[in-house]
């Protein structure tokens, strides 16, 4: 039978990066109070202190304060086992939290599940359909089981959903003959049989080949362009970087940072100047006298933190002091380096 799908609406942009505590540390004030679910109408998803402890004392999700902006594509990024799926299951009412509060589309949970979920579409832990039925027939059965769906418009809505995910030509094909990418797109179509304001996807590109990954990534962008807020979990850094506007970073159950991707980039280490020269000692002395910070010499290269000085000004200064400059550039930390610094471990970076 098909993966249960749940329905919902969206939230205000988080304009700055919020960096939380490292895993295992006490919960601390990060400079702003956690968002209040009662005042969460500007966000698609808001959590405050959301925690899940399993029997035996294992803490799967630890005091997560999450704020997903309305209209964003929010990447929920973290290594496997960091608590992403457990968080999603709590958001959708599939697992009860141990403590904390949350809201969907401005509606406090869990009391408002019946009101909020019809506006939320979700695909959690992979799609499941009848293999011997066609894609269209599977959607018909799903739609008929939805008490909120209008049977009079079923044919038109199913056709529109198939067209939206690019499966119109394969509508009559048996599900067992679908590629992995087609199966994932059919699951998204099932979640969008009626208009949704929030779409929650758990690892939607997991196990897909590069072509299937591109298909799903393109589809998510199109859905977001239509005004739906998309909350997508992933352990693939490249996926989050290519399709998301905002990101939350999980590590061993804790949310260690969240905000716009551009702001996260800016929150990394300061850019470093790199000078390739046969006169490394002289170049280092010039940079130090000019007030640049953290001057280092290694393997015929000199690096330093420029601060407010313009790179072209520094290059001209070196040349004016008689330093032979063979190469000059500015190195900024990659998104991968920033996230590894936040989590203390790496991410899969392949497509």
Predicted feature locations:
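Short, flexible helix/strand-to-coil boundary loops that buttress conserved ligand/catalytic motifs
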Residues: 143, 265-268, 342
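Compositionally biased, low-complexity flexible segments
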Residues: 22-26, 30-34
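Primarily ABC-family ATPase nucleotide-binding module
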Residues: 34-43
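C-terminal coupling/interaction segments
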Residues: 2-20, 24, 306-351
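ABC transporter nucleotide-binding domain
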Residues: 217-305
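ABC transporter nucleotide-binding domains
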Residues: 42-47, 52-251
């Amino acid at each position: 039978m098909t993966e249960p799908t749940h329905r919902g609406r969206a939230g205000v942009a988080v304009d700055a990066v919020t960096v939380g505590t490292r895993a295992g540390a006490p919960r601390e004030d990060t400079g702003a109070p956690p968002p209040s679910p009662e005042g969460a109408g500007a966000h698609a998803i808001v959590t405050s202190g959301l925690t899940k402890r399993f029997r035996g004392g294992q803490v799967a999700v630890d005091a997560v304060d999450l704020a997903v902006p309305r209209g964003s594509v929010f990447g929920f990024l973290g290594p496997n086992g960091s608590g992403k799926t457990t968080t999603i299951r709590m958001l959708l009412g599939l697992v009860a939290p141990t403590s904390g509060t949350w809201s969907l589309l401005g509606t406090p949970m869990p009391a408002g599940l019946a009101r909020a979920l019809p506006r939320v579409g979700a695909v959690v832990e992979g799609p499941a359909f009848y293999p011997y039925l066609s894609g269209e027939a599977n959607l018909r059965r799903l739609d008929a089981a939805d008490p909120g769906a209008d049977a009079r418009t079923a044919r038109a809505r199913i056709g529109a959903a198939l067209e939206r995910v690019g499966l119109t030509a394969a509508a009559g094909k048996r599900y067992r003959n679908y590629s992995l990418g087609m199966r994932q797109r059919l699951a998204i179509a099932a979640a969008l049989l009626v208009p949704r304001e929030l779409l929650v996807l758990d690892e939607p590109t997991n196990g897909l080949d590069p072509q299937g990954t591109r298909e799903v990534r393109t589809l998510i962008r199109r859905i977001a362009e239509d005004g739906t807020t998309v909350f997508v979990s992933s352990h693939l850094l490249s996926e989050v970087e290519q399709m998301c506007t905002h990101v939350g970073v999980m590590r061993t159950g804790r949310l260690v940072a969240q905000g716009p991707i551009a702001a996260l980039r800016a929150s990394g280490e300061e850019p470093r100047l790199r000078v390739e020269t046969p006169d490394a000692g002289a170049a280092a002395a010039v940079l130090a006298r000019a007030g640049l910070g953290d001057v280092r010499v290694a393997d015929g290269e000199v690096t330093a933190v420029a601060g407010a000085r313009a790179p072209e000004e520094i290059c001209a200064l070196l040349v004016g002091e008689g330093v032979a400059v063979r190469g000059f550039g500015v190195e900024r930390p990659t998104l991968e380096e920033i996230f590894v610094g936040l989590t203390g471990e790496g991410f899969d970076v392949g497509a």
